[in-house]
């Protein structure tokens, strides 16, 4: 069956083929039903005589974890699709916390560039930006600050959208490198043409 995120029983049940006589079974219908499972990107179904079916699933590849505002942790793929998994170790430990409305399985976080940017921030090592940038937490805020990197030292970097993310990250790195001990509440790089920080 080739399943990591979907149990054999769930796939068998979703296919709708259990107990269906071979001459009435529809491989196309079973494939369509299987593709409604959020963790399934595609499926191949073969009806085999005298009375069996062979199901092969192509599952989504988890690139990280997306924690919704209701504390449900979803796996997320590079296209931004959220899905559950029977394998809790089946995704990298990179986490993004979403403070916006709760999410559901199969929902897509748009644009994919936002997912990529958030996971790049989640991959930063403690102390990589500056010595007190530890206990990092990547957050999608509900307000205008958008994508935010919060630190255990109680200061944050505000990135906003994923537009021009590389420039924003470079600007934040440069500012933090040049100000390794400055007391901060926030560094705002939402506009890469101008940096705002507090206290200034």
What are these regions (language model features)?
Residues 1-32, 36:
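Short extracytoplasmic
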Residues 10-22, 42-200:
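Charged, solvent-exposed interaction patches on well-folded alpha/beta domains
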